[in-house]
Amino acid sequence: MAEGAELIQKFYDETLSNGNMDAIDDLVTDDVVDHEEGLPGQPEGKEGVRFFVSMMREAFSDLKATVGPAVESGDMASAEVTITGRHTGEFMGVPATDKSFEIKSIDIVRFEDGKCAEHWGVTDNMALMMQIGAIPEPAQT
C-alpha cells in the first residue's frame, strides 16, 4: 500500500475503529479543510473531524474501515474505503436497530507533512440509511 493510502487507513484504524481521539492531532492539520458535506451540526476544521468520529462511534459499534484501491499523485491520495459496523446507538434521530451495515466511500486527501490538510469525500449515505432501516429499500421488480 502506498504512503497516502497507508495514512488514510491509519486514520480510520486509529479514530473510527479504536476511538483514539488523540490520533486526530497526529494525523490532521490544525487548519484542515473538509469539502465533504458534514453531518448535521458538524463544525468546520479539526473540531469537525472530532465531531464526526464521536458521532459515528456513539451511533455504531464494531466499526471497521478497509482501504481498497488507491491512487496517489504528488501530495494527494484517493482511495475507495469499505466501512462496516452495527447500528447500536441513535444516529441522526434514528434509534438503534442493531442492524449491520456495509457501505462504500471515496476519500481524496491532500497531505502536508504527513497529515491530512484537505479532504474531499463521497459516502453512500443512502445505503447506510436503508441498511439500518431508517428508510425503505427500493421495491424489487
Where are these regions (language model features)?
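C-terminal and inter-domain tail/linker signature
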Residues: M1-T141
